Curated annotation (Swiss-Prot):
Designated gene of the protein: rplK
Post-translational modifications: One or more lysine residues are methylated.
SUPFAM superfamilies recorded: Ribosomal L11/L12e N-terminal domain, Ribosomal protein L11, C-terminal domain
Organism: Rickettsia rickettsii (strain Sheila Smith)
GO MF term list: large ribosomal subunit rRNA binding; structural constituent of ribosome
Protein name (Swiss-Prot/TrEMBL): Large ribosomal subunit protein uL11
């Protein structure tokens, strides 16, 4: 049995249970002649149990016969950091100038555990450092060990 020929990949960030044919989903899928309604239904069914509106990075694989498959990744680190710091937006200034909130090292470790499947490391300490770096770039101060 041969595998289907891959036509391309589409990377989108889609809110959980919020896929609609409107931009950016509709135009991205329409260009590759994918059934937009079928994708939206499948995606919304797959994310039904999640908290509505969580941003989910999604990789859509489009095949030559216009069929598709998709892989949902974990939400961005920035989503978790904003949630733990209880802020709505990160700093627009450089990390030394404006601190908009604080997260603990334990928070960063907890986020790293959640993000491990999508990070390019298998070491929890290295993953924690990646998350701490994301926090610093958002204007969050990391307190604790």
């Amino acid at each position: 049995m041969s595998q289907k020929a891959i036509k391309g990949y589409i990377n989108l960030i889609i809110p959980a249970a919020g896929a609609t044919p409107a931009p950016p989903i509709g135009p991205a899928l329409g260009q590759r002649k994918v059934n937009i309604a079928a994708f939206c239904k499948d995606f919304n069914d797959a994310t039904q149990g999640m908290e509505k509106g969580i941003p989910l990075p999604t990789v859509i694989t489009v095949y030559e016969d216009s069929s598709f498959s998709f892989k949902i990744k974990t939400p961005p680190a920035s989503y978790f950091l904003k949630k733990y710091a209880k802020i709505t937006k990160g700093s627009s200034a450089t990390k030394k100038e404006a601190v908009v909130g604080k997260v603990t090292m334990d928070d960063c470790r907890e986020i790293a555990k959640l993000k491990m499947p999508d990070l390019n490391t298998k070491n929890i300490e290295a993953a924690t450092k990646i998350i701490c770096g994301s926090a610093a770039s958002m204007g969050l101060e990391v307190v604790g060990n």
